[in-house]
UniProtKB/Swiss-Prot annotation:
Keywords: Aminoacyl-tRNA synthetase, ATP-binding, Cytoplasm, Ligase, Nucleotide-binding, Protein biosynthesis. ATP binds at R261, S262, E263, E348, I349, S350, S351. Belongs to the class-II aminoacyl-tRNA synthetase family. Type-1 seryl-tRNA synthetase subfamily. The gene is serS. PANTHER family: SERINE--TRNA LIGASE (PTHR43697:SF1), SERYL-TRNA SYNTHETASE (PTHR43697). Its EC number is 6.1.1.11. It is found in: Cytoplasm. GO terms for cellular component: cytoplasm. This is Serine--tRNA ligase. It comes from Streptococcus pneumoniae serotype 19F (strain G54).
Length: 424
């Protein structure tokens, strides 16, 4: 959530920044007018209350003097009626301002490339060289079916489109991947957490999914509960409405969880395979940091995600997202895109973002600065470390052999009971 004080004091700069995220200037101008009206009403209310207090004191004095107070009582009643009417108007204005501040996206950092969409993203670096095959590489969905480890047909029968069963060494591979990821993040100082997979609406508001993106989630009807779209939600809200000790920052959390997404608006996109599912496993990284340290922590988090891909020897690139392509809560985002041979393309496998104090303001997560004793909003960061299903897809395609088998990456073999190859 944006700081209304920053919008007031630096309106032109904020408007210019948000314009790069597709926010119409008319929206901010309307918000500015409503905010000015609110402040004028507050002044009127305070003036009327002061007058009412004066009249009240005059009534008390008149009664002590046994004087007639009818006119003064009538005047006080009129003042009270005016205050009540203005308070009602103020409540309506506050609701409107809240609607603005909770649905406007975060302000992009100065270092973020300016652009309307993915076409303006900037590649930062690449790692690894895509393998040259001496045969036509298969898509991971065909490999998975031929190996008998991925079953979309029965997933569709049991549930519907974009669901599947992992079987045998496919299930073992999925489990090996996320255990490997959690172990690697643990070495980097992350505390492993098992979170609730259902959260309440306040938690969804805290991280920015609600109210703007309700259509992308699976709500439990007639309840206050939602299936989590990412472990970012419960991990970040772990400290909601709390004041942390500054000397304990930064704090690192990691968790593996299922993620549930309706994929509204994704009709026709990635209809086959593991790239876009309604339910998938993901290992998440979340950080709580002091403002002056958060961008250094973003670089470290991105490196933590890269470490997984490097140890799996999967070629990838790091991309800085443009202002128009970033997520709602982010001030800066790096995407990691892994090489998918059958698509001859890099595909997203991780997003690492700094939200600065955007989520912390919504969730009221603060810290007491040990330097001056003041309570301040901290910065929150989140990143995929990594999307597990997409990692399965990348391994199947990059490690496939001409006979249809798939070699298991060396880093995963201790997690696979010593298995080295998945054979038809």
């Amino acid at each position: 959530m944006l700081d209304i004080k920053r919008i007031r004091t630096d309106f032109e700069a904020v408007a210019e920044k948000l314009a790069t995220r597709g926010v119409d200037a008319a929206v901010l101008n309307e918000m500015k007018e409503i905010d000015a009206k609110r402040r004028n009403i507050l002044i009127k209310v305070e003036t009327l209350k002061a007058e009412r207090n004066t009249v009240s004191a005059e009534i008390a004095q008149a009664k002590r003097n046994k004087e007639n107070t009818d006119d003064k009582i009538a005047a006080m009643q009129n003042l009270s009626a005016e205050v009540k009417a203005l308070d009602a108007e103020l409540a309506e204005i506050d609701a409107k301002l809240t609607e603005f501040t909770t649905t406007l996206p975060n302000i992009p950092a100065d270092s973020v490339p300016v652009g309307a969409d993915x076409x303006x993203n900037v590649e930062v670096r690449r790692w690894g060289t895509p393998r040259e095959f001496d045969f036509e590489p298969k898509a991971h969905w065909d490999l998975g079916e031929d190996l008998g480890i991925l079953d979309w047909e029965r997933g569709g029968k049991v549930t519907g489109a974009r669901f599947l069963f992992y079987k045998g060494l496919g299930a073992r591979l999925e489990r090996a991947i996320y255990n490997f990821m959690l172990d690697e993040h643990g070495k980097e100082g992350y505390t492993e957490v098992i979170t609730p997979y259902i959260v309440n609406h306040d938690s969804m508001f805290g991280t920015g999914q609600y109210p703007k993106f309700k259509e992308d989630t699976f709500e439990l009807s007639d309840t206050n509960f939602v299936l989590i779209p990412t472990a970012e939600v419960p991990l970040t809200n772990y400290y909601r409405d709390e004041i942390l000790d500054g000397k304990d920052l930064p704090i690192y959390f990691t968790a593996m969880s299922p993620s549930f997404r309706s994929e509204a608006g994704s009709a026709g996109r990635d209809t086959r395979g593991l790239i876009r599912l309604h339910q998938f496993h993901k290992v998440e990284m979340v950080k709580f940091a002091k403002p002056e340290e958060s961008y250094e922590e973003l670089e470290k988090m991105t490196a933590n995600a890269e470490n997984i891909l490097q140890k799996l020897n999967l070629p990838y690139r790091v991309v800085a997202l443009s202002t128009g392509d970033m997520g709602f809560s982010a001030t800066k985002t790096y995407d990691l895109e892994v090489w998918i041979p059958a698509q001859n393309n890099y595909r997203e496998i991780s997003s690492c973002s700094n939200t600065e104090d955007f989520q912390a303001r919504r969730a009221q997560i603060r810290y007491r600065d040990e330097a001056d004793g003041k309570v301040k909003l901290l910065h929150t960061l989140n990143g995929s470390g990594l999307a597990v299903g997409r990692t399965v897809a990348a391994i199947l395609e990059n490690y496939q052999n001409e006979d249809g088998s798939v070699t298991i990456p060396e880093a995963l073999r201790p997690y696979m009971g010593g298995a080295e190859v998945i054979k038809p």
